[in-house]
């Protein structure tokens, strides 16, 4: 029996998640949910369908895990707690300073509905944080550095998407 996966958001991250699912035979992509017109979204998985985000609740008994692939600035703070009420969820929330409040919101929604919410899974925090942990375990007297802070390395993609192209030209 495979784990049935849904993807919410089909930008670069959503497409990457779909490709990763294809490499894992114990995972099955069931649905992709989008805010765009579903018929305009072309996915690689022939056995999965594309739906409007408005139809996600109808699929709550057909999906084991919903991977939420939105932006940390505005999407994930709203979407992850909302969908944790219906699904087990995973997101890649990466605004370090707001992780505690995001955790609290997702945790409360997931506990209330009997679901599991896993947040901040990605590069940093995530794989980059694990690499730092491994290095600290080996180099016990070493000093590690991190390069995030106010206005640094937080939401670059989200900020770039909000640039008005007309004002740049």
Please place each PLM-identified region on the residue numbering.
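NAD(P)-binding Rossmann-fold cofactor-contacting core
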Residues: 23-45
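General beta-strand structural signal in soluble alpha/beta enzymes
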Residues: 89-92, 117-121, 147
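Active-site-lining helix/loop region of Rossmann-like oxidoreductase modules
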Residues: 2-8, 12, 16, 134-169
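Rossmann-fold NAD(P) dinucleotide-binding segment
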Residues: 56-61, 65, 73-92
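Rossmann-fold NAD(P)-binding glycine/threonine-rich loop
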Residues: 93-117
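Short acidic-hydrophobic, aromatic-tinged amphipathic segments that line or gate anion-handling sites
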Residues: 49-55
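Short alpha-helices
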Residues: 115-136
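Short, hydrophobic beta-strand segments that form beta-sheet elements in well-ordered domains
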Residues: 30-35, 50, 66-69
């Amino acid at each position: 029996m495979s784990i049935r996966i849904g993807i919410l958001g089909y930008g670069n991250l959503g497409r990457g998640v779909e490709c990763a699912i294809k490499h894992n035979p114990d995972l099955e992509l069931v649905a992709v949910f989008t805010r765009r017109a579903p018929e305009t979204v072309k996915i690689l998985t022939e056995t999965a369908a594309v739906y409007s985000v408005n139809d996600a609740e109808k699929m709550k008994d057909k999906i084991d895990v919903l991977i939420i692939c939105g932006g940390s600035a505005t999407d994930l703070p709203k979407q992850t707690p909302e969908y944790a009420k219906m699904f087990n969820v995973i997101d890649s929330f990466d605004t370090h300073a707001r992780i505690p409040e995001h955790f609290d919101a997702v945790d409360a929604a997931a506990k209330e509905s009997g679901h599991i919410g896993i947040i901040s899974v990605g590069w940093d925090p995530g794989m980059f944080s694990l690499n730092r942990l491994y290095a600290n375990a080996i180099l016990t007297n070493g000093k590690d550095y991190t390069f995030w802070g106010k206005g640094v390395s937080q939401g670059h993609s989200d900020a770039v998407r909000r640039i008005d192209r007309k004002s740049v030209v």
